[in-house]
């Protein structure tokens, strides 16, 4: 696996032409990827909180949040394997945080076996709050992680370029 550090990273809302690339990334990154129909629905319902990261014209990452009545829910985040460990996921989360109401709960679920992701989220200030048994279609448990969005400016996005 190649690790690429990217000093400037264009992050922008998903566009109609991005859905196929997001679906390809879903299939590459997840055992049980979301369907193209579901990705399209997410894009329509969350147009301002479905962000994509682009490197040299290629979509290399995305993150999407649903705004709920009492919390923000990270539905999915993915980075192409060749672009991991370069700060893309951290920058996507930071860019999302800037768009979300401060002082609210930010929640996600992650596979219990996905220890690198759990460590990443811990590093972003998330704490494990509970386990949901049999959450995933293959029967694997999910770890629920949460944190409050800071009322002051969030994670550093100085090296992000939002379009």
Predicted features and spans:
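Conserved acetyl-CoA-binding loop-helix of GNAT-fold acetyltransferases
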Residues: 79, 85-98, 119-123
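Short glycine/proline-centered loop/turn elements that form peptide/ligand docking sites
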Residues: 89, 93, 114-117, 134-139
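Conserved GNAT acetyl-CoA-binding A-motif
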Residues: 93, 100-112
């Amino acid at each position: 696996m190649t690790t690429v550090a990217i000093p400037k990273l264009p992050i922008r809302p998903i566009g109609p032409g991005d859905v196929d690339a997001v679906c390809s990334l879903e299939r590459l990154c997840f055992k049980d990827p979301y369907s193209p129909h579901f990705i399209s629905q997410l894009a329509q319902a969350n147009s301002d909180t479905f962000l994509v990261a682009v490197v040299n014209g290629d979509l290399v990452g995305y993150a999407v949040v649903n705004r709920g009545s009492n919390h923000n829910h990270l539905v999915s985040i993915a980075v192409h394997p060749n672009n991991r460990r370069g700060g893309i996921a951290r920058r996507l989360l930071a860019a999302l945080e800037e768009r979300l109401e401060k002082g609210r709960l930010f929640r996600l679920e992650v596979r219990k076996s996905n220890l690198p992701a759990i460590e990443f989220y811990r590093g972003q200030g998330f704490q494990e709050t509970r386990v949901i048994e049999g959450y995933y279609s293959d029967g694997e448990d999910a770890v629920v992680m949460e944190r409050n969005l800071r009322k002051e400016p969030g994670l550093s996005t100085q090296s992000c370029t939002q379009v």
